[in-house]
Amino acid sequence: NSVAYQVIARKYRPQRFEDVVGQEHVTQTLTNAIEQKRLAHAYIFSGPRGTGKTTIARIFAKCLNATDGPTTKFSDDDPRAKEITDGRSIDVLEIDGASNNGVEQVRELRETVKYMPASSKFKIFIIDEVHMLSTAAFNALLKTLEEPPEHVKFMFATTDPEKVLPTILSRCQRFDLRRIPAALIVKH
């Protein structure tokens, strides 16, 4: 009976908005947007390392693409939410801006954007460390952000929003995450 090894950060990573600690100003605003059906097409989460930017983007993706979504009240065994948690969803693509800073990856993304989601409501692109994209890649991305298809959502995470082109920032709903006080972390 072998127990699979799991990195502690993954094991305890929040899976729902109510599990996220110290970022209620972000999770409540996103919850309200879902409940009021007022969804933007692009979001940017900025803040220091370890504050939950990518985690919140993943949870938000689960809310948007849950079987009965968009909803924050998806069930624990929702197959679409599970796929996203396990990194198996073909409709939620995560890109690491630090290692994929080339124009080719963004051009590839622009080709993919044209196609409807396979089994979900939205095709979601989560780009981590988006500030690491090259200027040429930003410009290629901008074309898609200017006229995004209805079925596409972008979620960007960055520790350095000043390095993101203003033309990109202006097309995103921005959330600034705060450093989480140690006392708050200890309580959880």
Task: For each feature predicted by the language model, list its residue ranges.
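P-loop/Walker A NTP-binding region and its immediately flanking N-terminal helices
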Residues: 1-174, 178-184
